[in-house]
Curated annotation (Swiss-Prot):
Transmembrane segments: none annotated. Belongs to the GRAS family. It is found in: Nucleus. Residues 523-597 are annotated as: SAW. This is Scarecrow-like protein 5. Residues 304-369 are annotated as: VHIID.
Length: 597
């Protein structure tokens, strides 16, 4: 129940008529917000008593957008990604949703749902994580126990910025605050209207005047259901460390978002998680915790494959890169491919088959597969498994084949580790990986540009780049928040077309494959923020500075991608610009592919 929506306009009209003074106006507004919080909090605790605790499931990371179809069996088409988890309250229906949990201590964050493991927080060495359980209808429900938010929950005299909505969940404390607030209200209504007295009042009135323009704006957005606008206002409040405004907006947003609702509601649930984590300074700990868990069952390995089939983004990237490589080595007898994110090796299935059918006979193919050693659990083994699978496929296609696995981070790559040989045509592949490399804005090493210069020194025949078309690298928090919202909302909308909202795996796909990126973009800063996308224009500048020249994609590649999109929604758009391809949703570019030499 949003009492403030009704009380605030009524109170201000009474003030304008001279019926009550400004001091009383401020206290009435504050009282309505507090009462609204108390009602919602009691509702939450009555529900939370029924929550059981089990071990949390695992999420898959967006670093592994490849199908495991090397054995060409349906049971081996699973996409495998790095482990992570994402939880959010899921109501039985959007209209009946009641997620109005006012206190930070009661709010479910990713960190609070980290299973039975304990992950230390940056700002709290004694942090402990609670467990999470699933209800019988597979709705993710968790009971938070987040010590990282304790500074918002402790009502000590030294803390003057405590919000009435962010206090401790203890009943006695709430009753004491409510009694004091009622006494202040009674006193204020008996006093004359003195501006100085009003100006000396604390709480919402002191920080915002009677009702700030931001609050009016937010209330109007809430009344018309403008979820994007309310999310933006909450992000502004978080950036300004405006705890009272943030608390109130979080309580409203909890009633507006849903992991089973419209695309904007589903994305909003994860963006809200990111905002709460950022405010608690726990984003980096959450992100690390999401990456270090082990798989709990083979069914979790299917999520990326579902996304791979539902949307053409990754097929677009792989097929366009393979087309450029096939064109560049069409007359070569010895081909060496360096893949800077080999994952399952699924990208190379179609290329090996194409090379096996090449007129004049196949070339000798050697692949150097680089992958972060942390991802070995996703394959349930080391890179030798990738080599074995690709080797079997190459043998079936009559392609002489050799594989070398390099289990190291891209920031650790040196020339001597790549095994380059004279007389080989060299192709280098960067599939959705360079945006994870820190640049000059993060570290003096500037691994992003260093890696490009290193590759240029190898004199490759072709270098392929596939990246998300977004500007989140050096953008300040608020512009980055808006960019994240616009980019991922288009992705969520495209998923909505293919996977019904009652699809039993859709929530898992979005939580495990996309939410991790969203939380990292919003909650983390500095070296902890690994998602650092750049638009193609900036990548062009980097490649030019490293000494590369464009290698325009052929018309054959363009035709191949157009044929691919025929089996998907007509809302997908394909644009060729300056030798590069842009795949978008409703004319909003989401992913780009280009080649260099």
């Amino acid at each position: 129940m949003r009492l403030s929506v009704f009380i605030i306009p009524l109170v201000e009209s009474r003030q304008a008529s001279g019926i009550i003074n400004k001091q009383s106006t401020s206290l009435l507004i504050r009282f309505s917000l507090y009462l609204e919080a108390s009602i919602s909090t009691k509702s939450f605790f009555s529900k939370s008593q029924r929550i059981s605790q089990t071990q949390s499931p695992i999420c898959l990371s967006a670093n592994y957008y490849q199908p495991d179809n090397l054995d060409m069996e349906a049971t081996q088409k699973h996409m495998i990604q790095e482990g992570s988890s994402m939880f959010y309250h899921q109501p039985s229906s959007v209209k009946q949703m009641d997620l109005s949990v006012q206190t930070f201590d009661s709010y479910c964050t990713l960190e609070s749902s980290s299973g039975t493991k304990s992950h230390p927080c940056l700002n709290n060495k004694n942090n402990s994580s609670s467990t999470t359980s699933f209800s019988s209808n597979e709705s993710p429900i968790s009971q938070a126990n987040n010590n990282n938010l304790s500074r918002f929950n402790n009502h000590s005299p030294e803390e003057n910025n405590n919000s009435p909505l962010s206090g401790s969940s203890a009943t006695n404390t709430n009753e004491t605050e409510l009694s004091l607030m009622l006494k202040d209200l009674e006193t204020a209504m008996m006093e004359p209207d003195v501006d100085n007295s009003y100006n000396n009042q604390g709480g919402f009135g002191q920080q915002h005047g009677v009702v700030s323009s931001a609050m009016y704006r937010s209330m109007e957005m809430i009344s018309r259901g403008d979820l994007k606008g309310v999310l933006y206002e909450c992000a502004k409040a978080v950036e300004n460390y405006d705890l009272e405004m943030t608390d109130w907006l979080i309580s409203q947003l909890q009633q507006m978002v849903s992991v089973s609702g419209e695309p904007v509601q589903r994305l909003g649930a994860y963006m809200l998680e990111g905002l709460v984590a950022r405010l608690a300074s726990s984003g980096s700990s959450i992100y690390k915790a999401l990456r270090c868990k082990d798989p709990t069952g083979p069914e979790l390995l299917t999520y990326m494959h579902i996304l791979y089939e539902a949307c053409p983004y990754f097929k677009f990237g792989y097929e366009s890169a393979n087309g450029a490589i096939a064109e560049a080595v069409k007359n070569e007898s010895f081909v060496h491919i360096i893949d800077f994110q080999i994952s399952q090796g699924g990208q190379w299935v179609s290329l090996i088959r194409a090379l096996g059918a090449r007129p004049g006979g196949p070339p000798n193919v050697r692949i150097t597969g680089i992958d972060d050693p942390r991802s070995s659990f996703a394959r349930q083994g080391g890179l030798e498994l990738v080599g074995q699978r690709l080797g079997k496929l190459a043998e079936m296609c009559g392609v002489p084949f050799e594989f070398h696995g390099a289990a190291l981070c891209c920031t650790e790559v040196e020339i001597e580790k790549l095994g380059v040989r004279n007389g080989e045509a060299l192709a280098v592949n960067f599939p959705l990986v360079l945006h994870h490399m820190p640049d000059e804005s993060v570290t003096v090493e500037n691994h992003r540009d260093r890696l490009l210069r290193l590759v240029k020194h190898l004199s490759p025949n072709v270098v392929t780049l596939v990246e998300q078309e977004a500007n989140t690298n050096t953008a300040p928090f608020l512009p980055r928040f808006v960019e994240t919202m616009n980019h991922y909302l288009a992705v969520f909308e495209s998923i909505d077309v293919k996977l019904a909202r009652d699809h039993k795996e859709r929530i898992n796909v979005e939580q495990h494959c996309l939410a991790r990126e969203v939380v990292n973009l919003i909650a983390c800063e500095g070296v902890e923020r690994e998602e650092r996308h750049e638009p193609l224009g900036k990548w062009r500048s980097r490649f030019h500075m490293a000494g590369f020249k464009p290698y325009p994609l052929s018309s054959y590649v363009n035709a191949t991608i157009k044929g691919l999109l025929e089996s998907y929604s007509e809302k997908y758009t394909l644009e060729e610009r300056d030798g590069a391809l842009y795949l978008g949703w409703k004319n909003q570019p989401l992913i780009t592919s280009c080649a260099w030499r």
